[in-house]
UniProtKB/Swiss-Prot annotation:
It comes from Mycoplasmopsis synoviae (strain 53) (Mycoplasma synoviae). GO terms for cellular component: ribonucleoprotein complex; ribosome. Belongs to the bacterial ribosomal protein bL31 family. Type A subfamily. Part of the 50S ribosomal subunit. One of its GO terms (molecular function) is rRNA binding. This is Large ribosomal subunit protein bL31.
Length: 71
C-alpha cells in the first residue's frame, strides 16, 4: 500500500443545534454541526411542529377568505 494516500480518520463529536444532543462518529472532517438529529426530527419522534402546521392553516384560511371576498 502507498503511504499518505488515504485520508486520516478522526473521532468527531457531532452536535445537534436543536436539542443539544452529542454523539461520536468517525470521519475525515474534524468537526460537525447538524441542525436536526434523530432525537428531535419529527419523522423519528412522531411529533409534528404545531407552529408550522398552524401557520400553514392560517395561510390557507386567508387565501380562502380572500377568494370569497372577490366573488
Amino acid at each position: 500500500m502507498k503511504k499518505d494516500l488515504h485520508p486520516q480518520y478522526y473521532s468527531v463529536a457531532v452536535k445537534c443545534e436543536t436539542c443539544k444532543n452529542e454523539f461520536t462518529l468517525k470521519s475525515t472532517k474534524k468537526e460537525f454541526k447538524i441542525d436536526v438529529c434523530s432525537k428531535c426530527h419529527p419523522v423519528y419522534t412522531g411529533n409534528r411542529s404545531q407552529a408550522k402546521s398552524t401557520g400553514m392553516i392560517e395561510k390557507f384560511n386567508r387565501r380562502l377568505a380572500k377568494k370569497d371576498q372577490q366573488k
